[in-house]
Amino acid sequence: MGNTTSCCVSSSPKLRRNAHSRLESYRPDTDLSREDTGCNLQHISDRENIDDLNMEFNPSDHPRASTIFLSKSQTDVREKRKSLFINHHPPGQIARKYSSCSTIFLDDSTVSQPNLKYTIKCVALAIYYHIKNRDPDGRMLLDIFDENLHPLSKSEVPPDYDKHNPEQKQIYRFVRTLFSAAQLTAECAIVTLVYLERLLTYAEIDICPANWKRIVLGAILLASKVWDDQAVWNVDYCQILKDITVEDMNELERQFLELLQFNINVPSSVYAKYYFDLRSLAEANNLSFPLEPLSRERAHKLEAISRLCEDKYKDLRRSARKRSASADNLTLPRWSPAIIS
């Protein structure tokens, strides 16, 4: 092979641009020398440094980068608060429950065991803001996610399928159907959102009315295989979505992985950030988690869990503690004199 160019190129996802995206015509520059052309290849270490630099600004990889869905929802949240202030309406229609000395209200959602129903609602709301507040100029589209080219049902796709934004309830019903049929957990929903934002960042695409279902389906498919111990097979999704083929599911999964650059790792810090940002999104949109008064049984359970964690922490500190020897018990190796003739 050497410096020669190989004719064997791996198949990549087909790109399609909308009316807003135009490609400039390619004009070859005859003044370029041989060193400035393809023979001057970039070293792999340089590419790794660039990837590390970009990763710091990618919310799905770096815990300090703010999530995309939360930033996209800020405009709508400010408009809602402004309209409520102008119309002199209270900020929330649902009366909030506040804890007192005698009663403590807690929800049953934790970072390790989130509430399934409300987590799916929050993820659907995050996807809704992604679609609603997408780039107005339009970005690159991929054929594998186009519902007109790869329909999920045999019913005819309407001609204006890419014009109308889906409602939050429609997104919620689609995600809930997949999670209920496949018996997926709430943690899988959070990982689904991580993969979705990672896809939008890596592939530099937008989620829109034409592709949101297949993007969400691909993210759920991948998250269920990575997160759950008993992964759902592609043929199982074909039984849920009756009109889709196994070959289409396999191709969707393959191209989704390629666009993610096979980066399916989700650090615990990134997972926790997405969980708490989803809670912030729910609070800003009056989508509060169900609160229940703290009962005696639940208090004993929380106390037992805290004691267990405290005992584990003490054991770790005890095992990590270094032991020092005193001068009384200190023994040094003795060397016997050697005679060199």
Curated annotation (Swiss-Prot):
The organism's place on the tree of life at top rank: Eukaryota
GO molecular function: cyclin-dependent protein serine/threonine kinase regulator activity; protein kinase binding
Gene Ontology biological-process annotations: cell division; G2/M transition of mitotic cell cycle; positive regulation of autophagy; positive regulation of cyclin-dependent protein serine/threonine kinase activity; regulation of canonical Wnt signaling pathway; spermatogenesis; Wnt signaling pathway
Protein modification: Ubiquitinated; leading to its degradation. Heavily phosphorylated. Phosphorylation at Ser-71 and Ser-73 by CDK14 is enhanced during the G2 and M cell cycle phases, and creates a phosphodegron triggering SCF-dependent ubiquitination.
Keywords (A to Z) from UniProt: Cell cycle, Cell division, Cell membrane, Cyclin, Lipoprotein, Membrane, Myristate, Nucleus, Phosphoprotein, Ubl conjugation, Wnt signaling pathway
Impact reported for G2A: Induces a diffuse cytoplasmic localization
Modified residues (Phosphoserine): S21, S25, S33, S71, S73, S83, S99, S100, S102, S280, S288, S295, S324, S326
Annotated compartments: Cell membrane
Lipid-substituted positions (N-myristoyl glycine): G2
Classification via InterPro entries: Cyclin-like_dom, Cyclin-like_sf, Cyclin_N, Cyclin_Y
GO CC term (a single one): cytoplasmic cyclin-dependent protein kinase holoenzyme complex
Location of the Cyclin N-terminal domain: 143-265
SUPFAM superfamilies: Cyclin-like
Topology of this chain in the membrane: Lipid-anchor
Chain positions with Phosphothreonine modification: T30, T37, T67, T75, T331
Annotated function: Positive regulatory subunit of the cyclin-dependent kinases CDK14/PFTK1 and CDK16. Acts as a cell-cycle regulator of Wnt signaling pathway during G2/M phase by recruiting CDK14/PFTK1 to the plasma membrane and promoting phosphorylation of LRP6, leading to the activation of the Wnt signaling pathway. Recruits CDK16 to the plasma membrane. Isoform 3 might play a role in the activation of MYC-mediated transcription.
Family under the similarity heading: Belongs to the cyclin family. Cyclin Y subfamily.
Subunit structure: Found in a complex with CAPRIN2, LRP6 and CDK14 during G2/M stage; CAPRIN2 functions as a scaffold for the complex by binding to CCNY via its N terminus and to CDK14 via its C terminus. Interacts with CDK14. Interacts with CDK16. Interacts with LRP6.
The protein, known as: Cyclin-Y
Species name: Homo sapiens (Human)
